[in-house]
Amino acid sequence: MSEMQDYSSSLEDVNSRKFETFSYLPAMDADRIRKQVEYIVSKGWNPAIEHTEPENAFDHYWYMWKLPMFGETDIDTILKEAEACHKAHPNNHVRLIGFDNYAQSKGAEMVVYRGKPV
């Protein structure tokens, strides 16, 4: 069995901070993000975009970018909204969420653009 790898994360080192499961993997490129959006759409979940300042990522609510995209199935539209949020708030973290109507919870959540650490 291979050795367990330590994923150090500390508040002092802003570049080591982890947000969710995907933050322990290499950064997602545009193709991998697109596949995640395809997965959200294939599950019938409602996508939404949120953003926040890096210093508030852990102890504050994130701001909703517009309204959740209820019933949106066009992957390009969802990706354009995430990009528009990033362009409007270039220093903020931007995350994509898939809301599951059946379970009435988040089915997926991932940071798609990392903000500039302070």
UniProtKB/Swiss-Prot annotation:
GO biological processes: reductive pentose-phosphate cycle
The organism of origin for this protein: Allochromatium vinosum (strain ATCC 17899 / DSM 180 / NBRC 103801 / NCIMB 10441 / D) (Chromatium vinosum)
Task of the protein: RuBisCO catalyzes two reactions: the carboxylation of D-ribulose 1,5-bisphosphate, the primary event in carbon dioxide fixation, as well as the oxidative fragmentation of the pentose substrate. Both reactions occur simultaneously and in competition at the same active site. Although the small subunit is not catalytic it is essential for maximal activity.
Origin organism lineage: Bacteria, Pseudomonadati, Pseudomonadota, Gammaproteobacteria, Chromatiales
Induction notes from the record: Expressed when grown photoautotrophically (at protein level).
Name of this chain's protein: Ribulose bisphosphate carboxylase small subunit 1
Keywords: Calvin cycle, Carbon dioxide fixation, Photosynthesis
Domain of life the protein comes from: Bacteria
Quaternary structure, from the entry: Heterohexadecamer of 8 large and 8 small subunits.
Repeat among keywords: no
GO MF terms, alphabetically ordered: ribulose-bisphosphate carboxylase activity
Statement: the UniProt record of this protein carries the keyword Ligase: no
Family: Belongs to the RuBisCO small chain family.
Further facts: The basic functional RuBisCO is composed of a large chain homodimer in a 'head-to-tail' conformation. In form I RuBisCO this homodimer is arranged in a barrel-like tetramer with the small subunits forming a tetrameric 'cap' on each end of the 'barrel'.
Pfam families xref list: RuBisCO_small
